[in-house]
Amino acid sequence: MIQISRTLVVSALLILAGPVSALRAQSTGPIEGPVGPSPYNIISGWHKPFAEEGFAFGGSSGVFAESPNRIFVAQRGETRLPDPIPAEFSGFAGSIGINVLFATDMRVWEHCLYTLDSDGNVREMWDQWDHLCEGSDGPGPHRLRINPYDPERRVWLVNETFHQIYVFSNDGSELIKTLGEKNVPGDDETHFGRPQDVAFLPDGRILVADGLDNHRVIILDADGNYISEFGGFGEGPGQFNGIHALGIGPEGLIFALDRSGGRVNVFRTTNDPAEVEFVDVWGGFGLTLDIIVNDDSIWFTTFGPGRLVNFVKMDFEGNRLYTWTVPRELPDGYLEVHTFSVDSDGNLYGGDNQYGRTQKFVPKPDADPALLIKPPWVAR
């Protein structure tokens, strides 16, 4: 494992159908800095159900808006509903009190990857790849990304349970590459331990958040070959207790979410492609879930008091600029914004891994532009 130079050090309700151990694991953190209302309206009922009768969405673990009319969704299979279906069912499992994260006995590995149009209708169903998740005794697909520097716009899907990462053609017709060995965890150069995310540097290198077992970030070359790694388990600067998401910013900045540590670790690339330098760490949050980096700030999701989901904006110096809370109450509430993405029109999409659905947020007409999340930073 490479050594990270330390340039600066600055020192984490009830779930429907969730076990007590899981409740304790999902920590919350205080809200600090400016707090205000959401700058978005949620479009109620946007995600149109498509499952056969007796089934509903599973956990929405990965969302990526390639365009306003093509939104990729990775879900943890579908949810088998009780028979008879309760009258209050309104298209998603959470509406009848099912927490799909924990109701694993109701999970079926179907329709794991698909795209939606701007109105929330299914556009493409990639069920030819459902077999990549079948037989999983864990959560399965965890994150979905597209490399902004790839002219072929290949689709990357991280499978946490099988310790693998898949690379598909943009139209879903071909599985181009598989990284990792199915059901074989490891901490060497070719294996993963419950990987969580991938990110892409402008020079072609690929970063893998690896993950809940290995607590490291792996640096790969453009062809997926191992270069080096950084991180490690712990509570110190540059260490992780479950790295969950990655974001890339200007001037070589790398933001890595330490999920169970409730922190954001900041690194910077160097002239050596095998090394990064540690820059800073910002703590005091609940579980940190997903991140988007803009030109001069970051947005990430986390749990605040009462396990309410917060969107937090910070500048690159670690100052908390704004926090807004996502409602928990149905019909439009969230138990968890596990993943989020923003399209080129400024619409926000949030995947709920517990209620089991994806929703669309549109900017309010009078929203302050400074409080809106922009698409991820890309080098020009």
Could you say what each language-model-derived stretch is?
Residues M1-V9:
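Bacterial N-terminal signal peptides that target proteins for export
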Residues V9-P19:
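Bacterial N-terminal signal peptides
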Residues V20-R24:
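Sec/Tat signal peptide C-region and signal peptidase I cleavage site
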Residues Q26-R380:
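Eukaryotic scaffold repeat domains enriched in small/polar residues
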